[in-house]
């Protein structure tokens, strides 16, 4: 399953302006709620609870906030390129500027984990990350996300 099965073109924010991790999660929750029909506060709370367990920043300027929602019908992805890097409490100390939000139905189990692994592999590829950082509009970002890893490198 390609990453574009998880994220639609309208679920890409090419230059999100935020000043903190909390503000980023709020903005992402608002957009995710708008696109999925979920309650914005419920989405934000799920993301916040997951962050309390440990940061979802995976290093190299990338974060993958994620959570499960009982009323969600299918796995949903949202990608944001931040207009400037922010502190996301990353283990490598690097500020984050690429964020891929992943929401899954409560019973998603292995599918949720597989999606997380695919996203992490894609975004930790330095060539792909470089192309995402250089892309200035949603269509350009979507095109990079649509590339198979070997082609994107």
Curated annotation (Swiss-Prot):
- Which GO biological process entries does UniProt record here? phosphoenolpyruvate-dependent sugar phosphotransferase system
Please report the stretch or stretches of sequence annotated as the PTS EIIA type-2 domain.
5-148
Identify the main location. Answer: cytoplasm
The active site of this protein is located at: 66
| Transmembrane region(s) | none
Q: Which residues form the signal peptide?
A: none
Q: Does the keyword Cytoplasm apply?
A: yes
Pfam families for this protein: PTS_EIIA_2 (PF00359)
Q: Supply the alphabetized keyword list.
A: Cytoplasm, Kinase, Transferase
GO MF term set: kinase activity; protein kinase activator activity; protein-N(PI)-phosphohistidine-sugar phosphotransferase activity
Q: Which GO terms describe its cellular component?
A: cytoplasm
Q: Where in the cell is it found?
A: Cytoplasm
List the InterPro entries: PTrfase/Anion_transptr, PTS_EIIA_type-2_dom, PTS_Nitro_regul, PTS_SugarTrans_NitroReg
Q: What does this protein do?
A: Seems to have a role in regulating nitrogen assimilation.
The written remark on domains in the entry is:
The EIIA domain is phosphorylated by phospho-NPr on a histidyl residue.
Output this protein's name: Nitrogen regulatory protein
What organism is this sequence from?
Answer: Bradyrhizobium diazoefficiens (strain JCM 10833 / BCRC 13528 / IAM 13628 / NBRC 14792 / USDA 110)
